[in-house]
Amino acid sequence: MASEKVETVVAGNYLEMEREEEGSKSTSGKLSRLFWHGGSVYDAWFSCASNQVAQVLLTLPYSFSQLGMLSGIIFQLFYGLMGSWTAYLISVLYVEYRTRKEREKVDFRNHVIQWFEVLDGLLGKHWRNLGLFFNCTFLLFGSVIQLIACASNIYYINDNLDKRTWTYIFGACCATTVFIPSFHNYRMWSFLGLVMTTYTAWYMTIASLTHGQAEGVTHTGPAKLVLYFTGATNILYTFGGHAVTVEIMHAMWKPQKFKMIYLIATLYVLTLTLPSASAVYWAFGDQLLTHSNALSLLPRSGFRDTAVILMLIHQFITFGFACTPLYFVWEKFIGVHETKSLFKRALARLPVVIPIWFLAIIFPFFGPINSTVGSLLVSFTVYIIPALAHMVTFASAPAREVIRSCT
């Protein structure tokens, strides 16, 4: 029964998105379409892959030192596949919601559908409130982490200023993301972001193998249960990037083609995370327990400085990915979401950036935040809630009656 319903949904048409694509081809300049106006399957893949791994690429070797090599590899594979599965469930729910609304003649040309709206339309206000709380809190702290990470990374190549001062500077830089209207406009940034993480991952791999094992290196593995689960939550956070799946899907010309994109993106990301984390842990072993950022152990060189700079730029991109859904929520709350004035929307978004900037300044450490976000917020936001929502949405009639009686 559920599979038949899903098939019907996948066959749905997204007429206004197709009209928008045609309009874009006829009115936008070639440069605008090339660098700014994306909505293809490839754009969605670049967005998913680029957003999935950022600062955590540098902390995964630290997680390996807490977990041990074998557990680190197993957790990456497990959470990667689980994340791909729940991203698929989210895509099915989005398509179901979108199809129902289009049958009611709802026009989404000036409105970005978000996860909490999908839950509201399919399951009601209690699910909406649950999704809104966890998603917004997760994205809020995800944005804070990116600002803190910027200051932490730049310190490796320029320590003339303290980390808090660098947070002031990068907060101002990241505030410019208020001028990026939606995920349609991340085409160039998503592509560059993936190039940057690819370079950094392979630099870490090659530099570690070239360096060889440090003198007296040991690989103790999990010494304490707390450390073991701390390492696991960091990997959980790594593959929990599909909190923005709905927004990425909505930016596609044909969202029904999203189904396998996240899985393919995850497989590519694993080709970056597994070799880099394994190589750095092999080279430095237990030294990583006191060096959460892998770049701090690699010898300084032009290649390392390049990796630092590229990761700084990538964190700007990731900040935009995490913050843009928060911008949308705020725009809808104050009633400016559907306005066509980019300047008005940018001004309206500034109150979202300021508290994030403030939190990054007063909490200049991202390790504990990573663990908290991974263990609680990611678990519910991108694993538990989507799985439960899918089961309830496509439950049989008797099962739905039982659920109603319980709620």
Language-model segments: residues:
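Alpha-helical transmembrane segments of multi-pass membrane proteins, especially transporters
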Residues: 47, 75-80, 265, 345
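Membrane-interface "cap" regions at the ends of multi-pass membrane proteins
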Residues: 1-62, 66, 83-88, 110-112
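Hydrophobic alpha-helical transmembrane segments
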Residues: 63, 176-181, 358-364
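Membrane-interfacial loop- and helix-cap regions that link adjacent transmembrane helices
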Residues: 3-10, 36-37, 92-139, 144-167, ...
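Extracellular loop-to-transmembrane helix junctions
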Residues: 61-105, 109
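Alpha-helical transmembrane segments and their membrane-interface exit regions
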Residues: 82-85, 174, 197-200, 378-385
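Central hydrophobic cores of alpha-helical transmembrane segments in multi-pass inner-membrane proteins
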Residues: 55, 80-92, 171-179
